[in-house]
Amino acid sequence: MANKNNVTELIFTGLFQDPEVQKVCFVLFLPVYLATLLGNSLILVAVSISKTLHSPMYFFLSSLSLVEICYSSTIVPKFITDLLAKVKTISLKGCLTQIFFSHFFGVVEVILLVVMAYDRYVAICKPLHYMNIMSRQVCHMLVAGSWLGGFIHSIIQIIITIPLPFCGPNVIDHYFCDLQQLFKLACTDTFMEGFIVMANSGLISIVSLFILVSSYAVILISLRKRSAEGRRKALSTCASHITVVILFFVPGAFIYMRPSSTFTEDKLVSVFYTVITPMLNPIVYTLRNTEMKNAIRMSWKQKDS
């Protein structure tokens, strides 16, 4: 077997095979993607122009919105245009690029969610020291660390993948470049590469989830000493973040804990976290947040004027 790349182009099977169903998906998912761009952009603008939103919590939220735009744009535009294409192709280099950036922005989002949980912990459990602990310099370092963590993770994934030989077949059973599906096309045994990739992603997920759960466990314990009104106010600031964490982690856990033979269901779940969740996050964060809603209204008024 020649240890070289004869494959320069890959073919996606897509989400569905029926052309009519694909057209319906195009009509549904295009507005969802546009809503993702609009909703997250509004949060970015609102946080940047509103003086009432110049706090660490909203700084992290605006950073999360930027990542949501980038992550969604890595996968969704190609997916949407492919819904109208008879043959869904991507170059091998393009596939590797998509893998790099999808893992990059995905891990940045995970770490940012952990940072936001820590921010809530400090705000609720150490309110008198909040501004000293969460200084502007610390906030910028935490966000920079999130981006650095995502970069290191993606570099590891891509360094493992690039040397693999691909000499055919060239069909990926997905609508975007998934590492596990790409490994199946390699003309060599990829057990070790697959193990390293899963360990890399799994370690980040487990550690992040542990910190998230621990942070909110400490918060809940500390709230036992508060009044009913104090508990209500504190929990209201955490509810949106907890919802977003659930939306992010549950679909991923569903995919990686199911047998590999149920891949059709996995593709449908992938639609949720690549297409739907980035649109829902701005809604979740603004639905019960009066300050954010007022800031967005002000940004619209300034735009109209």
Swiss-Prot record:
It is a multi-pass membrane protein. Glycans are attached at N6. Residues 1-25, 77-95, 163-202, 258-266 are extracellular. It comes from the Eukaryota. InterPro entries: GPCR_Rhodpsn, GPCR_Rhodpsn_7TM, Olfact_rcpt, Olfactory_Receptors. Disulfide bonds join C95-C187. GO terms for cellular component: membrane; plasma membrane. Residues 47-55, 117-141, 224-236, 288-305 are cytoplasmic. GO terms for biological process: G protein-coupled receptor signaling pathway; sensory perception of smell. Odorant receptor. This is Olfactory receptor 4B13. The lineage of its organism: Eukaryota, Metazoa, Chordata, Craniata, Vertebrata. The gene is Or4b13.
